[in-house]
Amino acid sequence: MIDRCRSCLHLFNKHWVSEASGSIVVTETASDGASQAVFKTDKPCVIVKADKNAPLLWALAQRKCADGAFFLFDKDGAHLHIVELKSKIRLATWALTLNQFQGMFLTALAVARLLQVHELVRVTCYLAGTEDRITNESESASPTLLKAPVGMTKTFGGHESWDKGVVELPLSFKAALVKGWKARAPPRATILILA
């Protein structure tokens, strides 16, 4: 499958979509949360980098986008990994992050189609932060975000997805949520090893 993808990489600007192996680095450049998430793998990957002026796909209604994503290829097929880096994670931040995951998912899906990837084995969302302000609800944002609208089962802030560790994405996709905590001192990197 990776060979077919390689034959299509020329369709992309190498700054935004390229092949990677060994270490995959996703970087947050905003000064208040500047950090990196580093993934280690021996499998072939294609990385999708985000621009600070998201979205990468101009026609999307969802204008927000996560910091990066990558496709990991193994014998089963293509696995999509979506990565967002934050500093303090409050409920309001989490609601924004859900939108960023959705925007990057749709962008990555468009990239996948151009790479001749028509099916994803699994989608995983990663969120790395320095401080969890969601688990302790007294430290979180407005209580309004903890309430569900009348007749609905989901809260305004998406608290239930945080608790369950599942992110609902467009087109009926569901992704496992992996939470990581980065050090407060430089280089503030979260390192994950992928099999």
Predicted regions span which residues?
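Active-site nucleophile-His-acid catalytic modules used for acyl/amide transfer and hydrolysis
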Residues: 83-92, 117-121
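Mg2+/Mn2+-dependent nuclease catalytic core
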Residues: 88-108
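Short, surface-exposed coil-to-beta transition loops
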Residues: 63-66
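Short, flexible beta-strand-to-coil junctions
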Residues: 72-76, 130-132
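Conserved catalytic cores of phosphodiester-cleaving nucleases, focusing on short active-site segments
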Residues: 68-70, 79-87, 104
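Domain-level recognition of nuclease-like catalytic cores that cleave nucleotide substrates
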Residues: 116-195
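Acidic-basic catalytic patches of nuclease active cores, encompassing PD-(D/E)XK
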Residues: 1-61, 179-187, 193-195
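Alpha-helix termini
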Residues: 73-75, 109-118
